[in-house]
Curated annotation (Swiss-Prot):
Residues 1-55 form a transit peptide. Coiled coil: none annotated. The keyword Kinase does not apply. Disulfide bonds join C110-C113. The lineage of its organism: Eukaryota, Viridiplantae, Streptophyta, Embryophyta, Tracheophyta. It is found in: Plastid, Chloroplast stroma. This is Thioredoxin-like 3-2, chloroplastic.
Length: 192
């Protein structure tokens, strides 16, 4: 389901070297992640164009000065955890760095999990890079790992520090409530 985006003549006039047609971006479907390849074009410091979304950004202030653009990510893809050894490695790495880790336990068949994931990716961007977010597909890892983490419902979002579970949110209700609870969980951990 790819589209060719036809650039208007006004956009083409800003950068005459650009083709009037922007090729489609690659999108592969997966149970949880959607890798994306974008095609970016610049137009004289005024407009940034990506084939997935078109966004105009005016970087000149009214007084003629330049406005700094925030280059922090809008969302950060949750890193997959594929098994017990990988889970242990993530915990060990975080412990060495003295960081906490957020683990989102999901299932491919869980509609609430699928709906919540992009919202958690946006939340992950707020705490990036000091806090890493990962996801585990409970059907793709051994049951020992799921049991070890104490997961009984999906989605379950857990905060881990020093190899120990510190707190968890079970996300069976509205996504914005879950995201707020996860945010509070993270902020409460950073206070202690």
């Amino acid at each position: 389901m790819s589209e060719i985006v036809n650039l208007s003549s006004s956009l083409r006039s800003l950068n005459p070297k650009i083709s009037p047609l922007v090729p489609p971006y690659r999108q592969t479907s997966s149970s949880f992640s959607r890798p994306r390849n974008f095609k970016y074009h610049s137009f004289t410091d005024k407009i940034c164009l990506a084939a997935e979304r078109i966004r105009a950004v005016d970087i000149q202030k009214q007084d003629g000065g330049l406005q700094e653009l925030d280059d922090s990510p809008v969302s950060v893809e949750l890193g997959p955890i594929c098994g017990e050894s990988h889970f242990d490695q993530v915990m060990e790495d975080a412990q060495k760095l003295g960081e906490s880790v957020v683990i989102v336990w999901m299932a491919a068949w869980c509609r609430k999990c699928i709906y919540l994931k992009p919202k958690l990716e946006k939340l992950a961007a707020e705490f990036y890079p000091r806090l890493r977010f990962y996801h585990v597909d409970v059907n793709a890892v051994p049951y020992r790992l799921v049991s070890r983490a104490g997961v009984t419902k999906m989605p379950t979002i857990q905060l881990w520090r020093d190899g120990q579970k510190q707190a968890e949110v079970i996300g069976g209700h509205k996504a914005h409530f879950v995201v707020n609870e996860v945010r509070e969980m993270i902020e409460n951990d950073s206070i202690t």
